[in-house]
Amino acid sequence: MGIIYKMYAGESPSNKFPPMQGYPIWDGPVIDPDPTCNKHYDYPALGPSGIAIYPEYLTDINVLNCPSSARQGGVKMMTPEISAQEPGCLQYEGMIAQPDMSYFYLGFIVDKASMKTISPSDVFQLTVGSKTLEVSNQVASAYFKITAVGDDWKPKPEALDSDLKGPFAYPNSGNGTSDTIYRLREGVERFMITDINNPAASNKAQSEILIMSDLLSNTGADQLFNHIPGGCNVLFMDGHVAFQKYEAQGDIPCNALIANAIGLLAQ
């Protein structure tokens, strides 16, 4: 997937990586763009946008399926069987609907979601639907910028493909010392400076920026890890993959704050 994201970024405006999927194009957060195709995977996904990468960059959807996944089945796709039942879905046949069956991809830089680098005052009790869990203020601020409904996960498509700019619900939610949560893009590591008085020592390299990871969750739809003992294979922006063991107060992404966020948002 690393080379797929790099290829996409090389041809996209501003060298951006693909946005998060959110809703499939026939569904929407408030009103369905196409009411002729209903009740088929009509919920948002925490994976890369299928319409952005398939089939031009991602030629085989099985790349998105982890052999060790604890979820039943693989990536979901609109099929001829669905079109036979509902002809309005014919134009979407072959499109990916649920690219997050094994891995999660957010499309934004998350750099403030580990108790190693934030304080207890930077943690928020986020409620989504009937669930309430602790997430970092940065994740909560991004959530409120993206969702169309405050207490439910209904991401707006336009928000998923843009930088999230302050003011935020919670202060200091931007990446580094900025007032922006950046979309993933080539060169974005330049904005990750945490100490303006010593930028050379406090910036991040692409090898430290999270792109994609195995699903993990403390609750909700995904209570199991893909790999036992608990941990995740993590893809970083420079293309390397590393296995990270789960630690509640560990590094991003294999920690309690990220696991809580995925538990709240994954379906």
Question: Where do the model's predicted regions map?
Answer:
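Short, well-structured segments within or immediately adjacent to enzyme catalytic domains
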Residues: 2-267
